[in-house]
Amino acid sequence: MDFLASVVVAIVAYGAVYFIGKPVVALQAKRIEVLDVAERYSAVDAGAPEDTRDAAVKALFEAGTSLRAYERGWSTAVRLWCWVWGYDLDLAAQALYGLAEGPRAKMVIPPEARRNTLNALYVALGAAKHLPPETVDAIKRMIVETKAARAKVSA
C-alpha cells in the first residue's frame, strides 16, 4: 500500500511540476529577459550608430513578440499566475514595440515618453517596486486612459 501511495504522489508531483511549475518558471525567466532587454535598449534613439539601432530594434521586437506569444498561447497555470501577480503581457509587448520605435528613426520620441513607456513596462510586469508610488499611479492612469481611448476608437 505504501508503494502505491508513493507512486500516486510521484505522478501528482510530476504533473504539478510539468504542467504548473515549468510554464510559470519559463514565464518568469522570459519576464527577467524582457526587463533586461528593455533596460539595455530603452535609451537608444535615432542618433545612435546604425548597428546599435539595428540590435535594439531586433531585440525589442523579439522580446515583444515572445511576450505576445506567451499572452496568446499561455496555459491555465500561466494565466492564473499573471492574474495573481497582476501581469499584463499584452501591455508589456506593446510597451516593447513602443520602445522599438525610437531606434527605428521613423519619428523622434522624447526622452520623457520613452521613460513613461519603460515605466509602463515595469508596471505591466509587476517590476515597479523601484518607482515612486506617484509615478506608478500616474502610469496606471495613463494606461487606463489609453485603453479607454483604444476601446472608444474600436467601438
Language model: regions and residue ranges:
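Membrane-embedded hydrophobic alpha-helical segments
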Residues: M1-G21
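Conserved non-transmembrane functional hotspots
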Residues: V17-A155
